Curated annotation (Swiss-Prot):
Gene: TMEM65
Compartments in which it is found: Cell membrane; Mitochondrion inner membrane
Organism: Bos taurus (Bovine)
PANTHER family: TRANSMEMBRANE PROTEIN 65
Coiled-coil positions: none
Identification of the protein by name: Transmembrane protein 65
Highest taxon of the lineage: Eukaryota
Length: 236
């Protein structure tokens, strides 16, 4: 998988407030949002505040000009260069194959797409659930006793720790998955946009997260059962 997953998860708008000259520049049309509209995306937008989106401003999707612009501003210069090269290559292949009738992906290709998307999400689900259980249990047995917080509050704090850890561990999970030797599925641009490919990709992610979360429950083996719960209730 590419490095786009953690960026999509925490993408921010790092654009600066434009000056008077930039504010007077015309805004790009709404149809130039992806791929073939890269030149329009580079044009400055209207005045925007520094930092993340305001509370009342909805987060734009990547199929809009504003959403694509925010995503581009969140990337480093090397990542933008790599993304631009891949977009040009992808669009050139799509234009060359535009007049050709693309065949639907074969069952073998769909199976490969499924596996390629499932493996990284097994790692994500495993780490997320395991860290949440361990952190939530320790919070309940330490801070929970002192502050008298409930089990659900301790679980919520454990989930916070798990999410923070996931931001830093996402890159390592992707690097480990790439070392398994699974290359990007060999599909044409038209085959990538077909519904069969998208369904296979989403199913792979869903199954991967499910398997990872089930495997991530292994810390429960090392924690006690009813006796520890009774002792905790007596202490509270």
């Amino acid at each position: 998988m590419s490095r786009l997953l953690p960026l999509l998860r925490s993408r921010t708008a790092r654009s600066l407030r434009p000056g008077p000259a930039a504010a007077a520049a015309p805004r790009p049309p709404s149809w130039c949002c992806c791929g073939r509209g890269l030149l329009a995306l580079a044009a400055p937008g209207g005045p925007r505040a520094l930092g993340t989106h305001p509370k009342k401003e909805p987060i734009e999707a990547l199929n809009t000009a504003q959403g694509a612009r925010d995503f581009i501003y969140s990337l480093h210069s090397s990542e933008r260069s790599c993304l631009l090269k891949e977009l040009h290559r992808f669009e050139s292949i799509a234009i060359a194959q535009e007049k050709l009738e693309a065949q639907p992906p074969t069952p073998g290709q769909l199976r490969y797409v499924f596996i390629h998307n499932a493996i990284p999400f097994i790692g994500f689900g495993f780490l997320d659930n395991a860290i949440m259980i361990v952190a939530g249990t320790h919070i309940e047995l330490s801070i929970g006793i002192i502050l008298g917080i409930s089990t659900m509050a301790a679980a919520a704090l454990g989930n916070l720790v798990s999410d923070l850890a996931g931001l830093g561990l996402a890159g390592y999970v992707e690097a480990l998955a790439s070392r398994l030797g699974l290359s990007i599925p060999d599909l044409s641009p038209k085959q990538v946009d077909m519904w069969q490919t998208r369904v296979s990709s989403h199913l792979g992610k869903a199954v991967g997260v499910t398997i990872g979360c089930i495997l991530g429950m292994f810390p429960l083996i090392f924690f006690g059962g009813g006796e520890d719960d009774e002792k905790l209730e007596k202490k509270n």
